[in-house]
C-alpha cells in the first residue's frame, strides 16, 4: 500500500468537494499541487490520522531493511520493537480520529496473532461499518472507500488462514466485484483462486482465470493443487512445471518455505514472477498444502523440480 499516494488522493478529492464545480483539467492541476506538498493540504482529523499511519509504516519498513543480517534472537527483538512502535502509532492516530478504519485494521493485525481470534476481531470492526454505504456501492476510485475494501480483503485472507474456505471465497469475490475494473489492486483473485482449489471447484477457477489476461504464482499454484487433489496427475505435473517456470525460485519456495511477515495492511505489490511472489503464494497456500497428503513429497519426487530448487539455492547462496 502506498500511503503517501493515497493521502494525496484523499486531500485532493476533499479539496475538490469543498470547492464545488471543478473541471477535470482543473482537478489535475490541483492534484499536481497536492503532490508537491500533501501535508500542506491536510485540513481534517481523518487526513491527519492517515498521515500519521503513513509515517509509521515508512519507519516500520525502514527498520526491517537489515533483518537478514541479524541472528534469530536479534531479529525477534527488533521485530517486537517495531511492532510495539507501530501499535503506538496506531493508538496515536486513533486519538486524532477514532473512526480511522486503517488505524483500527493495522492495530488489530499488529496485535492479534491467532487466526481465529484475528478473524473475530476483523469481523467485529466490519460490523461497525454497517451503517455506511452498502459494500457493493463502494468504489476503488474513491480513496475514502479503500479502507473498507482493505478490511474485507484482510478478512478474506484470514478466513483462508482459518480454513473457512467458503467464507474466504465469498468475501474475496465481493472485493473482486468492486475492484476488478481497477485491476484487482488488493489481490482478491489470489485468495479466491486458492479457495477454488481447496473446494475442488475447477469450473470456478476456470471462470476466475478467464477474467484476467495473465496468471500469477497464486493461480498457477492453485491450478496445480486442484489437479493433484482431483488425482489428474499428468495435468498436475504440467501445472507444477508451469508454476516453476513462470516464477523465479518457485521450486525452492515450495521445498524450503520461509516465514512471511503479516501483511500490513494488505498484500505487498510484488513484481510479477519474482521470488517473493512465489514465497507469498506458497505461504498463503500452506493450509491447503498441509491438508493435501503427500503433495510436497510428490513435488520433490519430480527430479527436475528438486534440481530447480537446488540450483536456485546455490545461485543465490540460500540454505539447502
Model-derived segments and their meaning:
Residues 1-88, 92-95, 240-243, 306-320:
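Extreme N-terminal leader/anchor segments
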Residues 38-43, 90-97, 121-145, 177-185:
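Flexible helix-coil transition and linker loops at the boundaries of alpha-helical arrays
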Residues 48, 86, 96-103, 182-185, ...:
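Residue-level recognition of tetratricopeptide repeat
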Residues 59, 225-320:
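Long, ordered, amphipathic alpha-helical scaffolds
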Residues 119-130, 176-178, 210-217, 227-252:
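TPR/TPR-like (Sel1-like) alpha-helical repeat modules
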